[in-house]
Amino acid sequence: MSPTQEQLTALGGVFLAAVLVDRIAKTGQTNEAGLSCMLGSLLVRDPKDTLDVYGGDDINLREGYRALIGALERDPSTLQREPLRYALSMLGLERQLAKRDDMLDVIGKRLPQIQSQVEHFGPAHENVIAACGALYQDTLSTLRQRIQVHGDMRNLQQPSNASKIRALLLAGIRSARLWRQLGGHRWQLVVSRRKLLKELYPLMRSE
């Protein structure tokens, strides 16, 4: 994997979280495999490469890659507008989080507790989702910038859906942080679209 593909893998995680949030908000449906992949990504320590954070297989990220390709190609027929908005908002929130050592400290201390729950219940268990959602609510949701999620109010008002959305936003922002640590910058999404697409298409084909 090239350094750019390492970045795109992490960015695929941001977009996967965004796609899953949009689906829950609009339909109330959850992709359990995607949810498990993203919640699991919060807890990976010492991965051998970026893909290892997401279970070691590009197929886990294919919905995120698809949304990212749609955003980079700027084709109205494939552009997923709400997921793109959520993804860009997560990239923005990560920048705010990076300036808050106190918040990073809280997240760093609580993730090992969530890891213990995962070992006991599994990654997509309601207790784990609730704990991740609560961590988002106690930290990132207090920042000045907020992510407004649009969808069917009946879905958004269900406590289990609200927890899943918050947990996915937490995981998406973790992926945004990883993308940044790998050298990702927002200007690349505008200036280097063709280069990114050239590196991204093979990741989709590796399904």
From Swiss-Prot:
Location within or outside the cell: Cytoplasm; Cell inner membrane
Q: Cytoplasm as a keyword?
A: yes
Its record classes its membrane topology as: Peripheral membrane protein
Task: Enumerate the transmembrane spans.
Answer: none
This protein's record includes keyword Transport: no
For this UniProt record, the keywords arranged alphabetically read as follows: Cell inner membrane, Cell membrane, Cytoplasm, Membrane
InterPro entries recorded: HflD (IPR007451), HflD-like_sf (IPR035932)
Q: Which Pfam families match?
A: DUF489
Task: Report the GO terms under cellular component.
Answer: cytoplasm; plasma membrane
Family the UniProt entry places it in: Belongs to the HflD family.
Q: What's the protein here called? A: High frequency lysogenization protein HflD homolog
